[in-house]
Structures are given as C-alpha cells and as structure tokens.
C-alpha cells in the first residue's frame, strides 16, 4: 500500500503522517508498515539539535497509526467527519534503542483482541532487525458529538 492509499485510511496529514508504506496486511490479524526517518522531520531541530533522536512518543504514535490502518481495513471503512479513532491507552511501553535520521522503522502491529468496541494491539518497532520500541495499545472509534 503506497502513501496515496494510506492517506485514505488515516485522518492525519502533514506533519503528522508517520506511516510511509504498508508492506503487508492481513485483515483481523496484523500489519507491517514502514516509517522512513529523515533529517527533515519537523521534530529534529528541537529533539536534539546536536544529537537528533526521534521522540519515543512518536514511535508509539507511528505504531498506533499502523494499527488504525489495520482496523479501518478490517472494518471495511475509512475515516470520516462523523467519528474519530482515538488512541485510548498504552501499556508496557519500552524504548530499547534510539532512532536517528536515516533509520527505517519497521512497524509490526497485531490485533490482540476487540472487546466492546475497544481494540487492543501489540506493536513492535524495529530498525535493522533490532527491536527499538514495543507497546501494547488501545484504540476506540467514537462518534463526533
């Protein structure tokens, strides 16, 4: 799935789109996606000017965006102006190695369970085959009031 199709399944837009490509997706199961990290990212001038490191919360956000694509594809729907897909929580988040400009994040997310409209996922972010972050995440689709 290229960026044009990804934008059909994410409500996010620049500078907050954190998924560049989907390598594989199995409905109701898992997604493998890519975030190419470049020196041009808007957060690097402030995090940190002399030693740029991708903020860990944005790595988890990239995992959550991959999860959103998986969920919308699984539901057979797309984001719209009547509902919002909220990031509802995270557990067991671990950052194991820093992510730097030039790295390619491989985002692996699997559906753990869906209960009463709450989706639970397990996610891993890898660089060069090594896990750099992992998290359990929860999301929920809610109507806009």
Curated annotation (Swiss-Prot):
It catalyses: a (3R)-hydroxyacyl-[ACP] = a (2E)-enoyl-[ACP] + H2O. GO terms for biological process: fatty acid biosynthetic process; lipid A biosynthetic process. CDD domains: FabZ. The keyword Lipid biosynthesis applies. GO terms for molecular function: (3R)-hydroxyacyl-[acyl-carrier-protein] dehydratase activity. Gene3D superfamilies: Hotdog Thioesterase (3.10.129.10). Its EC number is 4.2.1.59. The active site is at residue 47. It comes from the Bacteria. Belongs to the thioester dehydratase family. FabZ subfamily. Involved in unsaturated fatty acids biosynthesis. Catalyzes the dehydration of short chain beta-hydroxyacyl-ACPs and long chain saturated and unsaturated beta-hydroxyacyl-ACPs. PANTHER family: 3-HYDROXYACYL-[ACYL-CARRIER-PROTEIN] DEHYDRATASE. This is 3-hydroxyacyl-[acyl-carrier-protein] dehydratase FabZ. The gene is fabZ.
